[in-house]
Amino acid sequence: MKEGKINLPENFIAPENCKVGDFYFSILEPSITKIDYKVVMSSRKRLRQIFRRDDTWPAEDMTLDENTKDLIRHESEFKQKKAFAYSVYPLDKNEYIGCIYINPTKKSYDCEVYLWVSDSNFHMLSLIHI
């Protein structure tokens, strides 16, 4: 996550779960470590271009434990209102398809938003509106 701060009202409360269009968002947290790891690793080559060009995340040898630590960090940042990461599902919640990250930025924007879906669900990317 970049240094900086998201400009939020003092009393802001981010929804932990919400429906947006045909999708359901839920806080990204450690209870989904195994499925998140599977989806991340199956899509790792494309994911290395999402946050910055030729990123090293996720590493070829990333472990389940490292993934769990990432999810613990995302949950902590969410609770501290530093950043907001959501897991993304279709409305029926039958399949975890990706993530949305709302991160602080040093640029003159309120935040940076990143979205990714698994390679197997890439066709759904254009249907998610945030």
Where are these regions (language model features)?
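GNAT-family acyltransferases
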Residues: M1-S120
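Conserved small/polar residues in nucleotide/adenosyl-binding loops
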Residues: I128-I130
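Phosphate/ribose-recognition catalytic cores of enzymes acting on nucleotide-derived substrates
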Residues: L125
